[in-house]
């Protein structure tokens, strides 16, 4: 906390100190109207360009804000063309907006910009005035519901876990499944490295023809973020503050028996009534404070911002403290021929991960057990366990309060980025660009389990008492790019040509130390093992390190954009890319794209339409997993009991490994008529030679793991975006927008005819896999036996699907897939929707975003393990849903535990008001109240109906490590998930 306050104080002094240079400002007011009929536009955005100063018009179309002479006002309204007006000597500025010119918008694409009407691929541009409102901590949430085909999932409320982002579903299997993030031209930057309040615009490149120019790193789509820049008015400095205070509570949990119900069901009575979930959860408080200053001098401008975030999770002790700082500097020289843009940022994040396993044990731990050992109904040596009660002799039973109070699980990450872009106008129509960027990401994690920890310190073991783990890693990335752009005009046509070179270099280093068997707790979490003597005091030591050689990506690229008669648009690009991750002979790939767009209304002249545009695009992108040394053999360090150090083969080499390639065809139709606009996208994507780490024959390869080109996938999808300015009256305006998307992915080829992935795990169901992967079938097929009742002995009965009179494996054996198994559901939704509503009533703004997913199922593993009333497990609590089957006393996976998980939820509701102030100290005050996850409509009995797009596995996850997400096994609701939270946040923003 001390370092947290120090950073905040430094930021405050730095930014407030700049205020002395600020020029005097005045109140600018006026009315924004429709240029056609003169009606007032309610809720129009009026922003001072390059600053955080802004307001919206009231019921009369009037506005008022503080600005200085030379400032540029940007006026925007849904369905109208933006206007920019320079502030002069007058204090009154009235603006009439023209309707319907949507295609004049500028869109950021790879290595340049285009007018929206010239784009021939699936690209969506969202400016600051269209972002979701309210206090938002994750930048991608600004886009939620704005971009069809963009899914943002937040399974659980873990503050240390980022949102899951998907563009058009499954874009790869073993490579990077999330879109490439580009921040101010810096490729691969982290979303955690940018504060949402620093973002000016976000452009989403969805299809292959748009992303091909970025090569392999753009194979899952691209999100281009443009941050705010400074004002270019000489001598002007603008200061702004944004703050948030929030509270989070648990949204939903698992229905279990109360202590009385547990005793009535025959549970072991230990004399207490403990609400374990209340013992380990809390109301999590959060706060955000941010300051920004921007200004200009001469031909230069700057913007500097800093913010601090302190977030508590709903699980006690979980949360983080984060500090962000960013500087943007822009200048021109040599008679404005040379443009220099420089950006740098730093992020530090101190994390307390806690142990989300405590939530699971809060569900299943005996509700009559005491928290402390001194309250035990029988003699109990509580000192041995740190004063806590423990259920000894039971499998998988640990006191959840002891877990979070005795053990430590923390981490720290520091990210540093800088990038510089130099542009030089060699001729009027020829520009040269040089870009340099570097990222340095350092992380450390620490886990400590004292000798008294029954959870992992093994307090009952005489051989191994106490445990500590230390992990450090460092990732470095360098980027050097040079490209030139030439623009020529001939007659009614324009031609833009871009060509360039890209060099990317990355490396990775990590160190791991594992020690245990402490003589006492003097070797603790705080000491951090500082001396060799500390190490000698531990009974055992394990050391491991990993260092990758420099991995390089080298590319040559070119693009041509042709516009004919301002109505026909042709775009083509070609990228030749090589990667050292692959072996000789397979390092280079060729990735082309081509697109054509036609402004049909230019020729059809349909008076009712402002826009009618058809476009078709095709693009090929390559893809590679993020880890280094894909084709090389990987060896690990082995520490012998005698102190010797050797190596062993961990993963076999594959010199024949080649590029994973994705070819995608996209057809788009754009329509706009007055206050209505719609975009329809149809796409077909083929992924061939997808890369996957698999289990292989030890006799052939010397080890059981190898990375291979494993098969082909095909995805077909449809996306629709609709927006309408529904109501516009003197005292109220209402704008609504809906995005719909659907897709299905089919396995066309695979190295095996079929396999079943996604292991259910212990206790008792280690041999049970649940997700079938079969050639010719959709990805996500939940597979298993059909529940058909209960026997007199309480065993489960399965349906004889094939009618041969034979049942699947007996109750004492693991289930094995045979003719009596069926597809029980699919883990991927049939379709998803987002519905955004923006209502202005007499100066108040209400923004509501609803989201839903339909057609998907989830394996409720909570029920599969803990719902049957096992007579041998009277010391564990039972899950107690309305779907429980009376008399069932065996835990066997079947269709009984596969549930439809359709849901419709209010994701975000923000009520805000702009309060015009003429105070010299504070101006343009905005106050907001936001609720997130306010309600969820679903019949799913688990904690969270959100689609589970990946599975982290148990012990037998198709050869995938337990901490590696398995894209081929969606649809499993894991028992170790962090429960979702409902959050209410008060926000305040003002300029001074």
Task: Name each model feature, range by range.
Residues 1-333, 338-347, 355, 417-418, ...:
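Short, small/polar-rich motifs associated with maturation and membrane association
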Residues 232-273, 314-315, 328-415, 433-554, ...:
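Surface-exposed loop/interface segments of Gram-negative outer-membrane beta-barrel transport/assembly proteins
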Residues 199, 325-327, 554-560, 568-576, ...:
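Extended, hydrophobic alpha-helical segments in both membrane/secreted and soluble proteins
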Residues 227, 258, 291-295, 325-331, ...:
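Residues on the lipid-exposed face of transmembrane beta-strands in outer-membrane beta-barrel proteins
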Residues 243, 306-312, 570-582, 616-618:
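Transmembrane beta-strand segments that form the barrel wall of outer-membrane beta-barrel proteins
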């Amino acid at each position: 906390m001390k370092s947290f306050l120090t950073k905040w104080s430094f930021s405050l002094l730095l930014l407030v100190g700049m205020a002395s240079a600020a020029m005097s400002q005045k109140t600018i007011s006026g009315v924004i109207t429709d240029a056609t009929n003169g009606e007032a536009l309610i809720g129009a955005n009026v922003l001072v360009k390059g600053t955080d100063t802004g307001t919206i018009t009231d019921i009369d179309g009037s506005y008022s804000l503080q600005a200085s002479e030379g400032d540029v006002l940007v006026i925007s309204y849904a369905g109208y063309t933006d206007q920019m007006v320079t502030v002069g000597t007058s204090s009154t500025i009235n603006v009439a907006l023209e309707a319907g010119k949507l295609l004049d918008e500028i869109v950021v694409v790879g290595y340049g910009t285009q007018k929206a009407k010239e784009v021939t691929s699936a690209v969506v541009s969202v400016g600051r005035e269209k972002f979701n409102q309210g206090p938002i901590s994750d930048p991608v949430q600004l886009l939620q519901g704005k971009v069809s085909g963009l899914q943002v999932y937040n399974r659980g409320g873990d503050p240390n876990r980022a949102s899951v982002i998907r563009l058009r579903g499954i874009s790869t299997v073993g490579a990077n499944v999330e879109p490439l993030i580009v921040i101010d031209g810096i490729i691969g930057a982290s979303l955690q490295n940018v504060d949402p309040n620093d973002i000016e615009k976000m452009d989403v490149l969805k299809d292959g023809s748009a992303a091909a120019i970025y090569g392999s790193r753009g194979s899952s789509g691209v999100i281009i973020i443009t941050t705010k820049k400074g004002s270019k008015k000489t001598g002007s400095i603008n200061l702004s503050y944004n703050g948030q205070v929030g509270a989070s509570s648990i949204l939903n949990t698992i229905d279990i028996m109360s202590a009385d119900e547990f005793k009535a069901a025959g549970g072991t009575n230990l004399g207490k009534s403990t609400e374990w979930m209340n013992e380990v959860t809390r109301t999590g408080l959060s706060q955000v404070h941010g300051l920004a200053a921007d200004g200009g001098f001469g031909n230069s401008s700057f913007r500097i911002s800093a913010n601090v975030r302190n977030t508590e999770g709903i699980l006690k002790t979980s949360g983080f403290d984060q500090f962000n700082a960013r500087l943007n500097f822009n200048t021109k020289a040599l008679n404005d021929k040379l443009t220099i843009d420089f950006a740098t940022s730093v992020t530090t994040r101190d994390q307390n991960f806690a142990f989300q396993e405590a939530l699971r044990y809060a569900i299943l731990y005996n509700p009559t057990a005491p928290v402390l050992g001194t309250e035990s109904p029988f003699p109990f040596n509580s000192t041995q366990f740190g004063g806590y009660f423990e259920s000894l002799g039971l499998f998988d039973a640990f006191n959840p309060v002891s877990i979070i109070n005795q053990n430590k699980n923390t981490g720290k990450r520091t990210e540093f980025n800088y990038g510089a872009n130099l542009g030089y106008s060699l001729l009027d129509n020829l520009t040269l660009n040089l870009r340099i960027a570097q990222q340095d990401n350092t992380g450390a994690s620490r886990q400590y389990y004292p000798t008294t920890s029954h959870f992992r310190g093994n307090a009952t073991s005489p051989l191994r008492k106490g445990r500590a783990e230390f992990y450090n890693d460092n990732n470095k990335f360098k980027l050097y790019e040079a490209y030139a752009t030439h623009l020529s005009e001939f007659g009614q046509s324009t031609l833009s040509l871009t060509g360039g070179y890209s060099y990317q270099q990355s490396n990775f280093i990590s160190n791991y130390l594992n020690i245990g068997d402490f003589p006492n707790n003097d070797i603790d979490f705080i000491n951090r093992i500082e001396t060799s003597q500390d190490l000698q005091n531990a009974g055992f030591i394990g050391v491991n390190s990993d260092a990758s050689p420099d991995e390089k990506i080298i590319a040559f690229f070119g693009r041509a954009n042709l516009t004919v008669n301002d109505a026909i648009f042709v775009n083509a690009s070609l990228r030749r890319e090589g990667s050292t991750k692959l072996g000789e002979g397979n390092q280079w790939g060729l990735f082309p794209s081509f697109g054509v767009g036609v402004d049909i209304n230019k020729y059809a002249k349909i008076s009712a339409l402002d826009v009618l545009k058809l476009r078709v695009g095709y693009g090929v992108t390559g893809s590679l997993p993020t880890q280094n040394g894909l084709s090389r053999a990987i060896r690990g360090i082995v520490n012998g009991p005698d102190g010797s150090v050797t190596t062993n083969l961990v993963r076999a080499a594959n010199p024949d490994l080649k590029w994973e390639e994705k070819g995608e065809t996209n057809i788009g139709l754009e329509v706009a008529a007055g206050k209505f606009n719609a975009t329809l996208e149809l796409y077909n994507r083929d992924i061939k030679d997808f890369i996957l780490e698999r289990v292989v024959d030890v006799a052939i390869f010397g080890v059981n793991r190898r990375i291979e080109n494993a098969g082909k996938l095909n995805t077909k999808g449809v996306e629709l975006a609709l927006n309408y300015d529904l109501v516009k009256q003197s005292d109220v305006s209402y704008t609504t927008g809906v995005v719909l998307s659907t897709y299905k992915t089919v396995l066309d080829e695979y190295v095996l005819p079929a396999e079943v992935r996604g292991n259910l795990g212990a206790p008792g169901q280690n041999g049970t896999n649940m997700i079938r992967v079969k050639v010719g079938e959709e990805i996500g097929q939940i597979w298993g036996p059909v529940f058909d009742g209960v026997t007199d002995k309480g065993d489960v009965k399965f349906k004889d699907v094939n009618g041969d009179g034979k049942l699947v494996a007996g109750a004492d054996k693991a289930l094995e897939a045979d003719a009596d198994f069926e597809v029980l559901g699919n883990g991927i939704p049939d379709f998803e929707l987002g519905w955004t509503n923006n209502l202005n009533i007499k100066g108040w703004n209400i923004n509501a975003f609803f989201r839903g997913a339909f057609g998907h199922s989830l394996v409720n593993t909570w029920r599969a393990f803990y719902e049957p009333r096992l007579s041998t497990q009277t010391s564990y609590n039972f899950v107690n849903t309305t779907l429980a089957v009376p008399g069932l006393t065996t835990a066997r996976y079947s269709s009984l535990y596969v549930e439809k998980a359709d849901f419709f939820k209010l994701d975000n509701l923000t009520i805000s008001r702009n309060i015009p102030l003429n105070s010299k100290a504070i101006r343009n005050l905005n106050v907001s109240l936001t609720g997130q996850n306010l309600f969820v409509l679903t019949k799913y009995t688990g904690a969270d109906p959100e689609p589970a797009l990946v599975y982290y596995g148990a012990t037998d996850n198709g050869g995938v490590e337990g901490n590696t997400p398995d894209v081929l096994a969606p649809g499993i609701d894991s028992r170790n998930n962090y429960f979702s939270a409902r959050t209410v946040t008060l926000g305040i923003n003002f300029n001074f």
